[in-house]
């Protein structure tokens, strides 16, 4: 999903806008030179000294202004997203609206999240204060060029931290547009800085004494590398990594509605979402009909120009992404998986993979264990909820999941048994500003969004006050 700070067998791609629908390289951008990095970090540190001292209400007002500007620039920003990573234009506009809602949420609610929390004590007073930490590095992916950045940057800017952004090399113009938007809203120079970093220079940033933490949304491999660097340099980190989310169907009053939800949960953003419904688990008595209808639904998604409002299936983010996904699909086919729909690259220019439904996937196949980052669904037959839970929890990932049942008590019972950070009932796993987002196991740690995301990079400082004549108690610790 995002570039890994670890050495790769593939050559490092430059920051460039490459239209995944046409293959055209629209614009390239030079890497930041290593020698330039320390000055930019020091500028961010100096900005923190001033930005962090401003009243939180002032910082929050700037976030609300950023939300207004984002909505005003919807067409421009959405067009950039579609150009750079191939998202359907209507979905790109939805991403802009979601990102703006996050900016506005922290602009409105942020100050209350930072209010001191008093602790009842026998004598005197005790409170926990929420203070900023300083300069933070965000490493963000291409699949949601605005939303992913904003869910990290907005709460931390309101807290009083300053932000350095290393965005994906696939969406440099989106990165620059967001930087300009923050500055136009009133975020001072240095408080939010886009960096076109080489992978090899990420450690230099994390290691710098002024940098207090790092947040990464990306692949498992990238997360492991960043966690290693953060640990080596004793920096706080938050990781939102891959997912292979279960979508469990226990019963259905309206099977068509459930199938539609499964298709939406799998094919939104051409399937390039960490929380997409990648592993579908359906009970015996519904399985055959569910698979048949899902295959028909997937087959109706025809590739086309993502900027055309009538298009239902956009390209993947790059030709390399399409080749990688097709290799996973072909591995499953070669080893005996059944293709219900799709299974091939369409005869259409662009980075497309046919919407694919696979069954009879077994543990010797890559598709059983690996995240499929594109429009491919794997459907499993299960006897009952116990088998569904066991299969769901057999994954090394633990990001999100969905449970569908007309019996809400039953669905709730299953949800509580899933080893994931999020579970949605009778709805595909999704995201909203006021709901915490994050996973467990190899899907990462820490939370973004809601009040929980706002407090990740704060100094939760205890202040304990005694009357002046209080006799000191025995000290321990």
Swiss-Prot record:
Molecular-function GO terms, alphabetical: aldehyde dehydrogenase [NAD(P)+] activity; succinate-semialdehyde dehydrogenase (NAD+) activity; succinate-semialdehyde dehydrogenase (NADP+) activity
Binding site for NADP(+): 142-143, 166-169, 218-219, 241, 371
UniProt record, GO biological process: gamma-aminobutyric acid catabolic process
Keyword Transit peptide: no
Annotated catalytic residues: 240, 274
Alphabetically ordered keywords of this record: NADP, Oxidoreductase
PROSITE patterns: ALDEHYDE_DEHYDR_CYS
Source taxon at top rank: Bacteria
Record field: catalytic activity: succinate semialdehyde + NADP(+) + H2O = succinate + NADPH + 2 H(+)
Pfam families membership: Aldedh
Record pathway: Amino-acid degradation; 4-aminobutanoate degradation
EC nos: 1.2.1.79
Annotated transmembrane regions: none
Statement: the UniProt record of this protein carries the keyword Oxidoreductase: yes
EC category: oxidoreductase
InterPro entries: Ald_DH/histidinol_DH (IPR016161), Ald_DH_C (IPR016163), Ald_DH_CS_CYS (IPR016160), Ald_DH_N (IPR016162), Aldehyde_DH_dom (IPR015590), ALDH_GabD1-like (IPR044148), GABD/Sad-like (IPR047110)
Family the entry assigns: Belongs to the aldehyde dehydrogenase family.
Function: Catalyzes the NADP(+) dependent oxidation of succinate semialdehyde to succinate.
PANTHER family: SUCCINATE SEMIALDEHYDE DEHYDROGENASE [NAD(P)+] SAD, SUCCINATE-SEMIALDEHYDE DEHYDROGENASE [NADP(+)]
Listed name of the protein: Succinate-semialdehyde dehydrogenase [NADP(+)]
Source species: Deinococcus radiodurans (strain ATCC 13939 / DSM 20539 / JCM 16871 / CCUG 27074 / LMG 4051 / NBRC 15346 / NCIMB 9279 / VKM B-1422 / R1)
Lineage: Bacteria, Thermotogati, Deinococcota, Deinococci, Deinococcales
């Amino acid at each position: 999903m995002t570039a890994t700070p670890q050495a790769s067998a593939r050559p490092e791609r430059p920051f460039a806008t490459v239209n995944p629908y046409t293959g055209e390289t629209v614009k390239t951008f030079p890497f930041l030179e290593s020698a330039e990095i320390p000055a930019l970090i020091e500028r961010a540190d100096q900005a923190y000294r001033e930005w962090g001292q401003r009243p939180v209400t002032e910082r929050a007002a700037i976030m609300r202004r950023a939300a207004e500007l984002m909505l005003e620039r919807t067409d421009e920003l959405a067009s950039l997203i579609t150009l750079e990573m191939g998202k359907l234009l209507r979905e790109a506009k939805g991403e802009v609206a979601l990102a703006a809602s996050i900016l506005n949420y922290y602009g409105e609610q942020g100050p209350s999240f930072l209010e001191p929390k008093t602790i009842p004590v026998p004598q005197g007073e005790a409170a926990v204060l929420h203070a900023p930490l300083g300069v933070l590095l965000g490493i963000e992916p291409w699949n949601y060029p605005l939303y992913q950045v904003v869910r990290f940057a907005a709460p931390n800017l309101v807290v009083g931290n300053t932000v350095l952004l290393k965005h994906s090399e696939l969406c440099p113009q989106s990165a620059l547009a967001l930087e300009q938007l923050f500055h136009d809203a009133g975020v001072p120079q240095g408080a939010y800085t886009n960096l076109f970093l080489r992978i090899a220079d990420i450690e230099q940033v994390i290691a710098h004494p002024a940098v207090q933490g790092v947040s990464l949304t990306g692949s498992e491999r990238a997360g492991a590398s960043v966690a290693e660097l953060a640990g080596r340099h004793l920096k706080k980190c938050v990781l939102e990594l891959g997912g292979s989310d279960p979508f469990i169907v226990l019963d259905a009053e309206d099977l068509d509605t459930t199938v539609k939800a499964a298709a939406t949960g799998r094919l939104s953003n051409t399937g390039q979402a960490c929380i997409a419904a990648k592993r579908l688990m359906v009970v015996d008595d519904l399985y055959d009909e569910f698979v048949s209808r899902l295959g028909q639904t997937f087959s109706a998604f025809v590739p086309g120009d993502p900027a055309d409002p009538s298009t239902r299936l956009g390209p993947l983010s790059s030709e390399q992404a399409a080749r990688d996904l097709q290799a996973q699909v072909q591995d499953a086919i070669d080893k005996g998986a059944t293709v219900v729909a799709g299974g091939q690259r369409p005869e259409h220019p662009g980075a497309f993979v046919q919407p694919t439904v696979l069954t009879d996937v077994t543990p010797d196949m890559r598709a059983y264990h690996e995240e499929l980052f594109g429009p491919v669904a794997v459907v499993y037959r299960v006897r009952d909820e116990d088998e569904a839970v066991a299969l769901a929890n057999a994954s090394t990932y633990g990001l999100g999941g969905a449970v569908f049942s007309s019996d809400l008590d039953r669905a709730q019972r299953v949800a509580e048994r899933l080893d994931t950070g999020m579970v949605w009932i009778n709805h595909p796993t999704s995201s909203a500003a006021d709901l915490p987002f994050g996973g467990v196991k190899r899907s990462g740690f820490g939370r973004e969004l809601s009040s929980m995301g706002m407090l990740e990079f704060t100094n939760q400082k205890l202040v304990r006050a005694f009357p002046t004549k209080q006799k000191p108690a025995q000290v321990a610790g």
